[in-house]
Amino acid sequence: MNTNKVAIFGKKGSIAKYDLTDNKPIWVGELPKGQMPHVIAQYENYILVFSWAWFGSKMVHCFREDSGDSLWSHYQQTLHSSMIPFLPHTFENHMYYLASSKEVAKLSWETGDIVFRKRFKKSIFNEYGLGIISNDVILLSKKDALIVNKETGDVKPYPELSKKLNLKEITAALGNGISFMSLISLTHPQEGDGGAGATAAGGGDGGS
């Protein structure tokens, strides 16, 4: 078993998986010119990097944790509105998340392909959160529950859940496929915010 101390660090233009014991990089992943990593997170063998450039665009990148291979990059606005946190939930190697207050999205971890980013009808007084219960992708509010078709993104009422739970009393929920990714509620802080405290580092075998 490898007992070397390993962590992933980021600086302007790149991230690196670094062996602190042997004092050498294991791999270096390049970011687009001018992009500065601000938040680094891991889900299984995937590393997500949230970056920004001075007076420029914010981006999301995905790397393979074991090799450092770059899998994909997207501009933030392609994935989600800046007005809503990026809170992905995983089912069968895909992320499901709210791309805006009235859009649900599905994204492949492996390829970065956006399977759908689809609007659904909602009242301006109704705010939804997304969760995965068993095999179902659910949108939950204080008033009702909706179920999302995982292939098309179509949304329809899910009255069965409303009958079993008093939705008005629910303030938080934990379903499947969240891991610590649900904690990334502030994926693109302002440029003046602190940096080091926003970095997630793996230990030993790289956090896996």
Q: Where do the model's predicted regions map?
A:
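Secretory-pathway ectodomains
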Residues: 1-208
